[in-house]
């Protein structure tokens, strides 16, 4: 895994570095909302709920996540760590994702396991924060 090699190199060069988290866009989110006839100007809880569904559910024939960036990171063994509203307020960020950005956490000791699980089952590994958000927003 290239990510594991890069992470180990970074750890060697930066003593104490032990957490590898991305801040990634969700470039198809607004288009997906339009396709689902969901108001992109909904309140924050509704936006969070829809972002979580967009990132973890699939409308695709292969069962992969709707979001191509999610598919990339999850396929590389990351877990869905956090969804951030109003994180990209650039015009492109607002047009493509309503400002939503996503953290993916790479746990180096779990990369292969998560990668294999994702490719076999398309299961999205989620952090405790995402599980708590799921409960709060009443998403199964």
PLM region spans:
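Extended, composition-driven regions rather than compact fold-specific motifs
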Residues: 4-140
């Amino acid at each position: 895994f290239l990510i594991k090699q890069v992470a180990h190199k970074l750890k060697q060069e930066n003593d104490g570095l032990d957490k590898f988290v991305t801040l990634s866009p969700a470039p198809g989110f607004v288009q997906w909302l339009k396709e689902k006839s969901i108001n992109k100007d909904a309140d924050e809880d509704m936006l969070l709920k829809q972002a979580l569904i967009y990132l973890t559910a699939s409308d695709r024939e292969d069962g992969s996540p709707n979001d191509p960036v999610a598919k990339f990171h999850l396929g590389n063994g990351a877990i869905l760590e956090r969804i951030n509203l109003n994180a990209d307020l650039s015009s492109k960020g607002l047009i493509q994702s309503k400002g939503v950005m996503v953290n993916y956490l790479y746990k180096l000791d779990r990369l292969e396991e998560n990668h294999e699980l994702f490719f076999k089952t398309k299961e999205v590994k989620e952090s405790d924060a995402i599980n708590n958000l799921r409960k709060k927003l009443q998403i199964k």
